[in-house]
Amino acid sequence: MSTISFFATSKRTSCDRCRKQKLRCPPDKDDMGTCGRCLRAGVACATSYTKPRGRSQKHGISTDGTSHVSGLDMQEPALPTPESVLSAGLTSSVQVAEDGSQLWSPLEEYNHLPSLSNFESGALSQSQDEDFAGLWWSPLHEDLDLDVHMDPSGACQNGYSAEISSFSRTDCSRQSNDCSPETLQHVECDMRLSQLNLELCRQSKAYHHWPNTTSDGSVRRPHFAIASALRDLLQNTEAFIHILHCLRNGTELNLDGRYQEPISTHDTGVSPPSLAFPSILNLTSCFFRIVDLFNVLLSSLALELATHSPLQRRSSSSSVTSALQILPDLKLAGLAVQEVSLQTKILVLTITHHFETMERLLGLPADLRVSECKDDNGYGLLGASWTSVLSSGRREKFELGWRRTGNWVTSIESLKANMGTLTKGSC
């Protein structure tokens, strides 16, 4: 059995190589002071001062800039405080305790970040620009291959470019070139589209909660309420068409968001820009809400006209005709249109024209169209992949929308039937 030899060796006298391996130097050393382990390895044996481990004492940090070591005549600089490291040229208020010593708190780190006004006034230096631009950059941008479908603003496509990293006012023109007018226009259209979708939802909810029923239990709305709802819905439909034109042709969106005739309605034959998936959902939701609203309103209008038709045949006076006005403000060649059948025919033609425009700009297939237009140019905003999903949903009769709107496939077929009924009744 071999004997174990013990020898007294101070840990602080171990060389750097032995200390790194968590060993102690063997007692045999040559004339140069090289330990046996380093001598056998053929490497230089060096002994440095061991660094203290653990967190330094807070009260051991001197705040006057110098600290005197007892027993020595030299002065060494004090260790830097966290505030001096974090400041990096930025000025911040220094908290002073009652005894006059400087205290540091983690909350002071927020004071080192510049305010939002500094970004606008261009108060940041070039080095600070690069540091803060690094906060917005991530290597995941290249790994995930993010595109406009995940980031509508396009800010993630250039992970760390010099244009995005600059926050000074002198580079605003360069930033505006990166954020193209088309991108800003898409953001503006998305915001207006969300507002329009919310307005259509409110209109649907308000109309479905009108508690007007007849003695037999059928739903009846007064004709003046139907006329007001039709006017609001036509205005929202025109606003939706205007947004579609802006997204399709890249034109500017008016402040009121209303549709104007000078905008070109002809296709350029060029594929429209790819939209973000939330924008596609907003477009789809707005279209089918418009379909459902027109379906309910025209169904109520057909019921109202069927109720007033026997009264008109029995009465030769114009009191009944004047009482029932679908479009009371409608004028033709400067003259007010009083005939109900003519108002109905003009209303159906207007709705048909609006649906033809919406379906052409969206690129809907024939089985999802309300109008009889067969123009399938394949350059719609929704894209072929999404329209194929909608077509498969039509075949499987999936339901979209909120609780009382019903099946959107049924709404399309019912709207076609109601428009046909009103067209025959107005002849």
UniProtKB/Swiss-Prot annotation:
Which portions of the sequence form the region Disordered? 51-70
Instruction: Locate the compositionally biased regions of type Polar residues.
Output: 59-69
Q: Where in the cell is it found?
A: Nucleus
- Record-linked InterPro entries: Carb_Metab_Trans_Reg, Zn2-C6_fun-type_DNA-bd_sf, Zn2Cys6_DnaBD
Tell me one Pfam family matched here.
Zn_clus
GO (cellular component) term, any one: nucleus
Instruction: Tell me, in one coarse class, where this protein mainly resides.
Output: nucleus
Q: Which residues bind DNA?
A: 15-45
Task: Specify the domain of life of the species encoding this protein.
Answer: Eukaryota
> What keywords are assigned to this protein?
DNA-binding, Metal-binding, Nucleus, Transcription, Transcription regulation, Zinc
**Annotated GO MF terms:** DNA binding; DNA-binding transcription factor activity, RNA polymerase II-specific; zinc ion binding
Its biological purpose is as follows: Transcription factor that regulates the expression of the gene cluster that mediates the biosynthesis of the phytotoxin stemphyloxin II.
* PANTHER family, per the entry: GLUCOSE TRANSPORT TRANSCRIPTION REGULATOR RGT1-RELATED-RELATED, ZN(II)2CYS6 TRANSCRIPTION FACTOR (EUROFUNG)
Per its record, how is this protein called by name?
Stemphyloxin II biosynthesis cluster transcription factor sthR
Q: Give me the gene this protein comes from.
A: sthR
